[in-house]
Amino acid sequence: MKTGIVVRVARQAGLVALFVATALVGTASGVLFAYADDLPQISALDDYRPNTITRLLARDGQTIGEFATERREVIGYDEIAPALRNAIIATEDAGFNQHFGLSVSRIVITALKDIFTGQRAGASTITQQLARDLFLRQYMREGGAFERSLERKVKEWIVAVQIEKRYTKPDILRFYANQIYLGHGAYGVEAAAHLYFDKPAKDLAPEEAATIAAIIQAPERLSPFVDGRRALMRRNYVLQRMEEEGYLTADQSRAAQERALVLQGQPTQERSIAPYFVEDIRKTLEQKYGAKALYEAGLQVQTTLDADLQVAANEALDRGLRRIDKRRSGFRKPARNVVAEGHAIDRFTVERWKRPMLAGDIVPAVVMAVPAKGASGTARLRIGTRELDLPAPAFAWTRRTSPADLFKVGDLVDVEVRTVKDGGPETLALEQAPIIEGALLAIDNRTGQIRAMVGGYSFTRSKFNRATQAHRQMGSAFKPIVYTAAIDRGFTPVSIFVDEPVSYTAGPNQPPYQPLNYDRKFEGPVTLRRALEQSRNIPAVKAMQEVGPRQAVAYAARFGFPEKMMPYLSLALGAAEATLVEVTSAYSAFPNQGVRMTPYSVNTIADREGNILEENRPEAHEAIRADTAFVMTNLLRGVVQRGTATAAAKLDWPLAGKTGTMDEYTDAWFVGFDPNITVGVWVGYDEKKPLGNGETGAAASLPIWIDFMKAYIDTRADRKNPPRFEPPGNIVFVTLDSGITEAFINGTQPQGVAVVQTAAPASD
């Protein structure tokens, strides 16, 4: 009896299945011709070119920037680890290697479930998923009605079969593996392998391959960065499926399942080491090639940036701005209190705590406890799961002895990690983000290539690039241009200017122009060298008068400065505005025998196949004669050895440069060079307000420049045998009574003195 019932039920189920299959096949046949003309051309896969990442590379090949709508790296079939190929097939389509694009049995089972239980189940093969993702999404919108859903499904079947007829199974799996979305902006298995495990897809271990295959079903829910427990369960399910399908032995599957889920990547893209530099290039690329090419075409951009120097520039500017901020502004109350914001203080977390920490890193910390008001002692701070003491020496710069005078429980403060232990912070020092701004730019003298660029304290805080966009008054940093014009007109380093009170007619209904020196004193007769080294204002104005303001403006234009400068005597003291890149580029002509190279940041741009679209080469402009340039270089060396920049002399390296300070200390500059590189530093507020009394170029900008140059010198292979400023053949050297060995253009040296040598001295 029971056997008969079972037979009848089985027969009825079989008839239903046969009916459903017949109906589906009939429906498919009926609509095939109706839809055929409306379907995409499958041959488009012959030239499979999905959206890929545009990459910016430093000189050493390090990636410094990426732009993409879909973060994808296209790879070949052989670059996909066999374990990953097997994991995908075992999980997504076990019959992949046998079917012709459709799995009729899965279609029937799915249809029956839908009809009899109302449960929707996935029946799509890998080929169907590929058809849907590559072609059909752009041809139709998803509809809620059954008829609309059936129409979409039939088109999907047709396209899947066409794909199977045209391409091999390895081709189809390659297309699929490069196309699928795998969470956090990563498309394709190569991008996912780097995202989750920081390695290429070809090097994935079975448990890593299973993790990636596990994500395909629901990337937003199954990402191990989102839910580690769920991701682990799903990974182990994939490993079990691989065992069931014969891709792993039971022992291999068990061993892989027992391994912890260890992630090596980052859930978000790491910040660029050169965000201002990268953004500058991004704007140029978008303007030249268009947004579509920038974000989808996978351009490969080889830049001029030196990654090591860029890191040094970041650190030097950060340290310098923090130093100035502490001495000028003091401690500012924390802007955030997590308790006041409604957070549970024990559970509050920040993204930065999830990343590794090294000594010197600046990280946020939450204040967990402070002593009573007015009582000295230590504060208790938390970083991640670690609670650490902040002793009095760690906040001594605030000039407060009680932590309660500085902050309260729940405040979020910045701290510097002084030492680390067991992968986490051990000792801390209180820090704060400076409100002052600055910029640093380094240019290769012989090519004009930009080696490092920092456009401000924080790109997150402000994307305004103070290295290229901020027009600021130059102060005394403009004086070398004036003195260069004077030397070209016959002046020499020993020409005399009288440093004395002066008054010039400024024009109708204008008060007379009466420049003063920084110290409000006058030295009487001084040499041009002395005037430049000590940055005396009156001699510079007199040199401008001798040259002629209009001629000085014309000279400035030869150095790359804007021609719109007004020809006033105050120009000698830097009243005109310029950008840091303009000033730094101008100075680079001095050590380069008078030739200024146009600054540039991109060497080559190639398409995804490596075809060169653009190649930039150095562009030279002869600013001044080589002999004049060398005399100025020798004079500017004196600024470092005896003048306003003597702090740099301790570097024991051939250096030259000039400080610059504007009235009321609104702008502080130092621009200097060695035989190979020119580096400019500017410090100030975005709004033109004083930095504070005494914040000159020597006090504010020079220490930043020195920090950077220390790191630069350490990178040089010739640091034990420094390069030299090589003189042209018509330069002669004369040792003066002062003991200085002075450089002269032959024929301009003082009469009756002996020429001591015709090669550059090792030092003055």
Model-predicted segments: where are they?
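N-terminal type II signal-anchor transmembrane helix
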Residues: 1-57, 95, 115, 324
